[in-house]
């Protein structure tokens, strides 16, 4: 079994009296490996649970909404990888607040060798600093159909993977209990 180390971020901002989180939609033709365990345009309109339900009702298939994350490069620290992945996949820069938790799961690669992979993803709560959501390179469009702001309160209902839903809940709990943010 192969081991993979990844890192990702729950990048948040406070705007108009609400907390918002940066999320990405995977391209419709991508087929991400779903975890086997229970432990995973420059102008964009914000997504809420109500608008997502309305939009997906008319779609052929429900979009896969997830948190920005990716492999930790050799010699790179998990936090640095999380900051890099958020920047590459969403177009925004952010600063660390706190490590939320690690998600651990096993999946089978759907490409190449079909190898079983034990994956650990370290997630960090990050605060938006600058940039424009969905301002990503053309090369990233293979991985990201679009990036958008989602109400943090709605995120656990909107995200596709159980572990990422848990990270959104932890982030929401943290911002609600830390008024200094």
Regions inferred by a protein language model and the residue ranges of each:
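N-terminal strand-loop-strand
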Residues: 1-67
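Short, charged/polar surface micro-motifs in flexible loops or helix N-caps
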Residues: 16-18, 28-31, 73-74, 104-106, ...
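Short aromatic/basic micro-patch
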Residues: 66, 118, 149
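The catalytic Nudix box helix
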Residues: 67-102
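Active-site segment of metal-dependent pyrophosphate-handling enzymes
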Residues: 91-132
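NUDIX/MutT-family hydrolases
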Residues: 125-126, 130, 134-168
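C-terminal alpha-helix
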Residues: 170-178
